[in-house]
Amino acid sequence: MKLIRFLTAASPDVCFGVVIQNQAVPFAVLQKKAGKATPHLADSRSYLANLPDSERVAKELLAWGDLHLGEFGTGECHPLEMVRLLEPVEVAALFDFGLTPRHLKNSAEVLMKYEKDNPQTAPLLQAFAKAVMAPKPKAAPGRPEALSYYKCNMNSIVGDGETVPWPPYTSRLDVEPELAVVYGNEKQPVAGFCIFNDVSARDVQPTEFVGGFCLTKDMSKGNQLGPYLVTSDEVGDPSCDARHSRSSLDDGGGRP
């Protein structure tokens, strides 16, 4: 099941719905036509808070809509290419984890390549590379492994198809396609998965290792989420998932 939040040309109101046969269908319309009302599908936050019941009802409506889509009139469903897809969930918090040692090693090597002749950043990067490549100590028995992460800019989260304006303070903007795991609640911790485009200003990053990422990650529209919240049953094994993304960057004439 692919859950979406979207806007249509006819209304400024955000719709929470599902993809049926390449159509964006609001849950409000599905409930009305199927005669099955529930507050769990009012918006994405209600959906996440009421898992797993909300997922069960959503799938029932999806199955009904798939059988009866031909009965929907104008304005009740919308071709995906005619709507504006927003981030599929209203994000309460966004954390980016460094879970892949190979990725961290590659990142350190790339930064070292470009900054090796910079006396202000080279020592910091050497220390970072040493820390990344050093073997991690094993967690004590009965204690969870310590994970490193940073908190993302909550004001820069956007959906699919948005163009990232190139910040004037960087000449090396990097876009990484990552897998986002969407948290539901204690009853069902994993609500589903999204593609997450993580945008970074690499030439600014070295000097921010000491105090935490600021300009490196704080550019407008620098956290792109979407296009769908895909439920676990459709994803399968997320560790084997191949992520593909296409990014649009606009330097606006201001890129150094």
Regions found by a protein language model. Give the residues of each.
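Short N-terminal binding/cap micro-motifs at the start of the first secondary-structure element
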Residues: 11-16
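Surface-exposed loop/edge segments in extracytoplasmic proteins
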Residues: 252-256
